[in-house]
Amino acid sequence: MASCPALPFNMPAHIPDSLTIGRFGTGRVASQLAPALLAAGHQVIFVWSRTPATAEALAAHLPGTRALPTLAPPQPPADVYLLAVPDAAVAPLLAAVPWPAGALVAHLAGALPLAVFESQPAVRGGVFYPLQTFSPGRAIDWPAMPLCIEAAGPAAEATLLALARSLSRQVRLLSSAQRLQLHVAAVFANNFTNHLLGIADALLAEAGLPAELLAPLVRETVQKALAHPPFVVQTGPAVRRDAPTLAAHEAALAAHPVWQDLYARLTASIQARL
């Protein structure tokens, strides 16, 4: 993948310090993004949800923000409209909203290309992708979080960059192809890793062992992988080509054929890199 260095942490002089934001969606990302935008000095003028009560509940915690009860025209004017909705909902929402001419509309999806906006030539499309996992009750370190930007033109790009730089020191311009590759990598690093930890927890529970036993190992694994190329510091029976141990492990997984197959496939993947 092509290099994409982080951009300087400053706001372009021609972009207002305080932008007005219209927000569609009230899920985990949206619920954490809205307070961050307010803290950065922006105005979230409205939030919309398919469930009006959800929008009203979120708006009640955001000073100066109202719940938008309907998508009927006219849309309240805003500098940026952010679509914090599931990927599959972006295109239908784009088609359903009566956008003001020239509106800057950005989705927050990692795998959705900028081309999704081609069906709406009256809007200026963009991408405002926060690379992080969001969970209720867990605070986000916004300044350290990568924010990935793409836009259909220089004016839209400048505005989204200004918005991103007001939140994060890790702002990057990525093409749709780069962002898709990043999203795939993030699934391996986050979602698959978490699933493997879940399997490990379940196996320990079956043996009457506490999950805390693995905590030091998990911390060391992650710290080492961040400090060195992960393939270079790979350890374990697959690297050693320890056939008896590999066979014993697969036999121990006989009651879990899906995990047994996963173990064999991961072993093969590790050995293919040797």
Give the ranges of each region predicted by the language model.
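Phosphate-coordination loops involved in phosphoryl transfer and adenosine-cofactor binding
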Residues: 15-18, 102, 144
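Internal alpha-helical scaffold of NAD(P)-dependent oxidoreductase catalytic cores
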Residues: 54-61, 119-122, 139-226
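Amphipathic, non-transmembrane alpha-helical scaffold segments
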Residues: 48, 186-189, 193, 263, ...
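Predominantly flavin-linked oxidoreductase catalytic cores and closely associated redox partners
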Residues: 131-139, 153, 206, 231, ...
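Rossmann-like NAD(P)(H) cofactor-binding subdomain of soluble oxidoreductases
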Residues: 48, 52, 56, 60-139
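NAD(P)+-binding Rossmann beta1-loop-alpha1 motif at the extreme N-terminus of oxidoreductases
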Residues: 3-70
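Interdomain hinge/lid region at the active-site interface
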Residues: 219-274
